[in-house]
Amino acid sequence: MNKLMKQAQKIQEKMKLIQEEISKLEAIGESGAGLVKIKLNGSRYCNYVKIDNSLLKDKEMLEDLIVAAFNDAIRRISEIQQEKIASVSSSIQIPEGFKMPF
């Protein structure tokens, strides 16, 4: 039982480190061949939006491209997070059925 408690504590410590590292990650989503760029951090907060001046006259297209860039950024940050979790969790024994907190 003591061994299981120590292992659980190690898992908890590693997960805390993973969460801290993930919050520092960044990803840029793009659409319109790079005409719209959105940068998100690991907590999925938007850091910036870049819009090419050529898009300012077409509101509907601009709106669609912003949505597409945001969705691309979400996809990219999710992939980076999953890779990070997989790389760390492969080094520890996680009990079957254990769900990650994020």
Swiss-Prot record:
Gene3D superfamilies: Nucleoid-associated protein YbaB-like domain. It is found in: Cytoplasm, Nucleoid. Pfam families: YbaB_DNA_bd. One of its GO terms (molecular function) is DNA binding. Keywords: Cytoplasm, DNA-binding. InterPro entries: YbaB-like_sf, YbaB/EbfC. Homodimer. This is Nucleoid-associated protein WIGBR5260. It comes from Wigglesworthia glossinidia brevipalpis.
